[in-house]
Every structure is written in structure tokens, then in C-alpha cells.
């Protein structure tokens, strides 16, 4: 009997009351992966809450504040510079659905679209994009908009 391998994508709904459609999540993720010219080796996507994301932010990054998404590469060595790495995405993305629920009105969008933006943002980090500087922030925002507009209905005004 051949060995069993884990699926390249696992989605965990770990929020007590909020969730996103798994089919749409898979579609958004696959679009980003294809557009970036990479593949999924293994991605664990966890949809969770403020407490979990803040605890991870403190434990692993030594940041004592809330954030909307955290990405952790499971690859050895430095992350790729940006764009296709050729190795495939291998990592974990934690999305704070509470932040999406609290902030979506601020950006005149739906809760779902804001949460999908966090998913795309986390993937872009795993591909190698960096938003530590304003130019990187602008590039990532441009990519997020491009990918969301390609796969999701236009936001209502």
C-alpha cells in the first residue's frame, strides 16, 4: 500500500462564530498561487480570533499587539525575495476574523472580502513579499487588489 501524504492545503475554522466558505478560500488561494507562478507544498490556513493571533504574535514575534494576519514559513533559510520561489509555498497563515469583522466598514467592504484580503496578504508573505517599508506595502496592496478583483465579485458601494 502506498504511503499517505497530507493534502497540500488544510483549512481550519477555529473561530467560535465566524467562518468563510471553504470553496471560495480554495479558489482565492489557488488563484494567488497560479498568478505568482508557484505551487503549494503545504499550507495550513487557520481562521481564528483576536486572542489566538495576539498570543502567536507575542510568542513567536515578540510583538505585544493585535494584528490581522500572521504568516510563518516552514522552509529552511531565508524567504525568497518576492515573486515565484520555485520551491512552492510551505507555511502557516493565521487570519484574525475578529479584526476583519471590526474593520471592514472602515474600508467600505464586506467582512468576507476583508478576511479574504488577509488570506491573500499572508500568502504574499510566504511567496516572499515584505511590507516593512512603504514601497513594499504599496506593492502588496496592489497585488491584494489585483487578486481579489480577479476572483471575487466587485465590492458594493
From Swiss-Prot:
Binds 1 zinc ion. Keywords: Cytoplasm, Endonuclease, Hydrolase, Metal-binding, Nuclease, Ribosome biogenesis, rRNA processing, Zinc. It holds the Pfam family YbeY. Its EC number is 3.1.-.-. InterPro entries: MetalPrtase_cat_dom_sf_prd, YbeY, YbeY_CS. One of its GO terms (biological process) is rRNA processing. It is found in: Cytoplasm. One of its GO terms (cellular component) is cytoplasm. One of its GO terms (molecular function) is metalloendopeptidase activity. It comes from the Bacteria. Zn(2+) binds at residues 121, 125, 131. Its cofactor is Zn(2+). Belongs to the endoribonuclease YbeY family. Single strand-specific metallo-endoribonuclease involved in late-stage 70S ribosome quality control and in maturation of the 3' terminus of the 16S rRNA. This is Endoribonuclease YbeY. It comes from Salinibacter ruber (strain DSM 13855 / M31). The lineage of its organism: Bacteria, Pseudomonadati, Rhodothermota, Rhodothermia, Rhodothermales. The gene is ybeY.
Amino acid at each position: 500500500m502506498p504511503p499517505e501524504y497530507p493534502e497540500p492545503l488544510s483549512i481550519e475554522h477555529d473561530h467560535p462564530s465566524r467562518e468563510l466558505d471553504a470553496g471560495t478560500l480554495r479558489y482565492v488561494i489557488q488563484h494567488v498561487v497560479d498568478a505568482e507562478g508557484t505551487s503549494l507544498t503545504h499550507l495550513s490556513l487557520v481562521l481564528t480570533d483576536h486572542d489566538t493571533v495576539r498570543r502567536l504574535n507575542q510568542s513567536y514575534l515578540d510583538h505585544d499587539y493585535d494584528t490581522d494576519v500572521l504568516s510563518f514559513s516552514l522552509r529552511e533559510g531565508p524567504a525568497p525575495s518576492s515573486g515565484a520561489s520555485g520551491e512552492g509555498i510551505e507555511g502557516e497563515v493565521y487570519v484574525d476574523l475578529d479584526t476583519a469583522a471590526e474593520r471592514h466598514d472602515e474600508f467600505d467592504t464586506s467582512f468576507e472580502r476583508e478576511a479574504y484580503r488577509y488570506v491573500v496578504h499572508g500568502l504574499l508573505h510566504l511567496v516572499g513579499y515584505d511590507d516593512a517599508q512603504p514601497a513594499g506595502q504599496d506593492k502588496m496592496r496592489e497585488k491584494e487588489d489585483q487578486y481579489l478583483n480577479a476572483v471575487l465579485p466587485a465590492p458594493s458601494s
